[in-house]
Amino acid sequence: MSGPLTGVRVVDVGSFITGPFAAMLLADLGAEVIKVERPGGGDPFRSFERGLYGPQFRAFNRSKKSIVLDPDDDGDRSLIEELVRRSDVFIQNTRPGALEKRGLGAERLRAVNPRLVYCAIT
């Protein structure tokens, strides 16, 4: 999809509503959004109501690419950092401090990519 944000890459590690909704708006404006989901089921919103792709999940994650990576795994964390290195925006809505404990907080990711816009929604 083309739009004013064509050429902008977003890494979305959000779940449920707020993070995915913010990333969805950017995708609607043309950004390439890569949704990072945990192994073992991904975004909990997937299974609401009608199985793997419930209507809420489809609505909030339309136009996104998806990849399964575990932020607790060193190798997968390196892959997340590589995504961030090549991206413009990082959106997360985890509990405060959760990604910092895993080495994926704003300070660390801005060291990987100094021009990164880091959006933390709580």
Features from the language model and the residues they span:
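N-terminal helix-loop segment corresponding to the beta1-alpha1 unit
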Residues: 1-122
